[in-house]
């Protein structure tokens, strides 16, 4: 440690220090650079042969041949060229990069039904990523479903998904059958003869109670519908039987479940 300090002090007082440093730099610039392999040889390290990867590099420097390309522009290696040890030629990528559109959509929002002093409000969120035409088609579909409620009861429809879309079918309600004493208040022959069931709108139909304490239920189409147009708007048609039209009216007025419990419909 003392010797190093003495050297530093001596160099500070050495008047020709800059000249000596310049001479050293000049000598260093003129010195031949040697590879690590040559330095090992000078130090006496025994090296019999160069590794194969050095030999392959030397060959590539001395003999550079152009790459052979086939008609498709794919690189074909020269079979006579010496292969580097440990390297395995794998298949080259022979496909072109393709641009793939990636769309990140937001989370789907369920329909929201809210009620306030002004009534009920149903909010449907538009699906993400629709074009202008697809948006118009989606809105038209929702509008068509809403308007179809004029002609049938959507709550009574079956819902089935298919490859083409959705299939909704009217569910036929089968009335309960009970052993009761029939009351002949209508003439079957007359019902079958009419071409439009609405012609029997003023004709009453009677349903017997399930309990003796109740009075029979007597009702007509006029009591259930204000007009033939209203009857048609909820799914009625002239080919219905008188009883089917009455049951449709009970469902429309939301009286069917109450009547089914108390009377033999």
Swiss-Prot record:
Quaternary state and interactors: Homodimer. Interacts with the L polymerase; the association of P and L forms the polymerase complex and positions P optimally for encapsidation of newly synthesized genomes with the nucleoprotein. Interacts (via N-terminus) with N(0). Interacts (via C-terminus) with N in ribonucleocapsid (via C-terminus); this interaction allows to package the L polymerase in the virion and positions the polymerase on the template, since P acts as a bridge between N and L.
Acidic residues composition-biased segments: 58-70
GO terms assigned for molecular function: RNA-directed RNA polymerase activity
Residues with PTM Phosphothreonine: 62
Family in the record: Belongs to the vesiculovirus protein P family.
This protein's record includes keyword Phosphoprotein: yes
Signal peptide positions on this chain: none
Notes on the domains: The N-terminus is disordered and is involved in binding N(0). The region of interaction with the L polymerase is necessary for transcription. The hinge region is highly variable. The central domain is involved in oligomerization. The C-terminus is basic and essential for binding the N-RNA template.
Protein name: Phosphoprotein
GO CC, alphabetical: host cell cytoplasm; virion component
Keyword terms, alphabetized: Chaperone, Host cytoplasm, Phosphoprotein, Viral RNA replication, Virion
InterPro entries, alphabetized: P-protein-C_vesiculovirus, Phosphoprotein_C_viral, Phosphoprotein_central
Cellular compartments annotated: Virion; Host cytoplasm
Residue ranges of the region described as Interaction with the Nucleoprotein-RNA and template-binding: 245-265
SUPFAM superfamilies: Phosphoprotein oligomerization domain-like
Organism domain of life: Viruses
Phosphotyrosine carried by residues: 14
Annotated region described as Hinge, given as residue ranges: 171-193
Region span, Interaction with the L polymerase: 49-105
Main localization of the protein described in the UniProt heading: virion
Site annotation Involved in oligomerization: residues: 138, 141
Region ranges (Oligomerization): 109-170
Post-translational modification: Phosphorylated in the N-terminus by host CK2. Phosphorylation of the phosphoprotein is required for the transcriptional function of the P-L complex.
Region (Interaction with N(0)): 1-60
Region feature Disordered, mapped onto this chain: 42-72
